[in-house]
């Protein structure tokens, strides 16, 4: 269950500092662990570990691919805005926006295409909606439809999760801190 995931995270950490170079930052891993534990605590009383691990890990995956997509967007914008680049498009913001929605810039870098309504920021902005579970499920379906390698692989049980009202939104807000 989730305890196994956390154990593997703990075992992957390197407790000894490097002898040369910059000291390794450990805060992000601790933050990640803290968020995982807080997520588990939010759900533990309402469902068993076998179910809540799918919700938590599914949201983490959704946030990860969305964050990766946004990072690639920033790279694309920097490239098409740079007069020194072979891909320079001039100063017209409309041309830049069009480039940001060109899926080739993402797929050539092995970044999953994430439709606008499925992006984490869009979901986070709707986290307090009573139907956030269904919105997440629809986002996962949209991602599967746009990325053939993911078809049928994403767990879409958010709309059917039996949680207290507002709990799924709290979970989205919590995962947003990672």
Language-model features and meaning:
Residues 1-178:
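Non-catalytic, mostly N-terminal accessory regions of nucleic-acid modification and defense proteins
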């Amino acid at each position: 269950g989730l305890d196994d995931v956390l154990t593997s995270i703990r075992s992957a950490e390197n407790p000894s500092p490097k002898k040369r170079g910059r000291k390794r930052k450990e805060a992000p891993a601790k933050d990640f662990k803290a968020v995982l534990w807080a997520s588990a605590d939010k759900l533990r009383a309402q469902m068993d570990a076998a179910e809540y691990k799918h919700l938590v890990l599914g949201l983490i995956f959704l946030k990860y691919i969305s964050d990766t997509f946004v990072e690639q967007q920033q790279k694309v914008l920097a490239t098409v805005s740079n007069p020194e680049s072979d891909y320079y498009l001039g100063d017209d913001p409309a041309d830049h926006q069009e480039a940001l929605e060109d899926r080739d810039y993402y797929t050539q870098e092995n970044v999953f295409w994430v439709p606008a309504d499925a992006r984490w920021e869009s979901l986070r902005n709707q986290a307090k909606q009573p139907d956030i579970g269904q919105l997440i499920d629809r986002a996962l379906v949209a991602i599967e439809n746009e990325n053939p390698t993911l078809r049928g692989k994403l767990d879409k049980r958010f709309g059917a999760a039996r949680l207290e009202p507002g709990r799924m939104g709290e979970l989205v807000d919590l995962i947003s801190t990672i």
